[in-house]
Amino acid sequence: MKVYKFGGASVKDAAGVRNLLDIVTGEQELFIIVSAMGKTTNALEAVFTAMQQGDEATALQRIDESYAYHRTIIDELMGADRTIEDIDKLFEQLRNIVRNTIYRSSDAELWYDTIVAYGELISTTIISNYLNGHGVANRWIDMRRAFLTEQRHKDANVNLEATEIRLKREIADSNVSVFVGQGFIGGAPDGTTTTLGREGSDYSAAIVANVLGAESMSVWKDVDGILNADPKIFPDARKIERLNYMDTIEMAYSGAQIIHPKTIKPLQQKNIPLYVRPFGNKHASGSVITGDVERAYEPIMIQKSNQVLLKLHSRDLSFVLEEKFAKVFNTLESHRIKTNIVHNSAVNLYMSVDSSWHIDDAILELEAEGFDVEKSEDVEMVTIRYYNDELYQRYAAFDERIIIKQVTPHSLRFVRHK
């Protein structure tokens, strides 16, 4: 079994879906994971926002706009007279959620997951139908039934043992060897829909690869492979042919967009190679991530923009006590806020954290626990792994925008004003 994952940018239009068909034609023993098409997740987030605000008319309008977008793709692929009943049913389900739900803020994340999951349900239904009509017999899999997650919304973890049983049951006794399933989504023990975190389709594919013992996983992207930097920011960026699991985890943790941070562990557990391959050229080698690659590449430079800087001041001047640190980290963890860099003095603590819905709630709690908190949102984090003196001098030695700097033998990391 191989696992292929296709992102939303790759299947944003009919041409992309045709290219997917070209890539998978002739493959056997293949599990295909697909994201929502194009910017559909953003569109469905707009539906959710309108629902939060009690604006039913706008929510329904956004659904109709999404339907028109997907209908255009279907028309180009299959003809204007082709009806896919399951697509119409999915959109009608969305409309009924908006019309019939009594929204409560305490259920915000539940309804967020329920609504945005339709992006993947719709994309995979279109693609499964198209493949079946063009010589690639396949079975559509509802990953809400196949993936058992914890009872947590927006960033759920997957129960591997239970998921292995469920997924194998879903594909058992099939007369086909190709399967199409959704990335990003799963199901909680109570049957509600969960999501695995933004851009979580990579993680979904890695879970499938793990529980099915796949020989490899391939992520098809609109890049030549893994680059050592974002070429939009660092013009001298070059492709890395081979990378090990550990450095990939470091890159993902630091904000590299190439792979979702949770993706590597399920692959590493079973030593499954991960290929990052160019969607526009199926014959190109791309990059490969395995467990047996020695470091033999250039410095890796990553810029992460969705950062918030928190400056905490202890009112009783006792910040050095471990109890104070514990309070801060426990509060942030309870709100699922990821901390990236921490720097402390005797009574002040500086923290760079990922932007989150819950930051203001966490700040209120921290203030109640005896801290004065200042928040800055105009910051970014830069990481240079395997830096050298020339890079240190160029980026970190004299930049007055830098607020926090961390230097280790292998990594240079700093937070600066944009």
Where do the PLM segments sit?
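A conserved active-site cap/scaffold subdomain adjacent to cofactor or substrate pockets
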Residues: 242-290, 295-297, 305-307
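Residue-level "edge-of-site" marker
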Residues: 144, 222-223, 280, 345, ...
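Electropositive, surface-exposed helix/loop patches at the edges of structured domains
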Residues: 171-188, 251-275, 311-325, 375-396
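Conserved dinucleotide-binding and phosphotransfer motif residues
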Residues: 134, 270, 335
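A conserved regulatory-domain signal marking ACT and ACT-like small-molecule sensing domains
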Residues: 285-418
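Nucleotide/pyrophosphate-binding catalytic subdomain
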Residues: 1-256, 264, 387, 417
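Short, glycine-/Ser/Thr-/acidic-enriched flexible segments
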Residues: 8-9, 37-38, 185-186, 201, ...
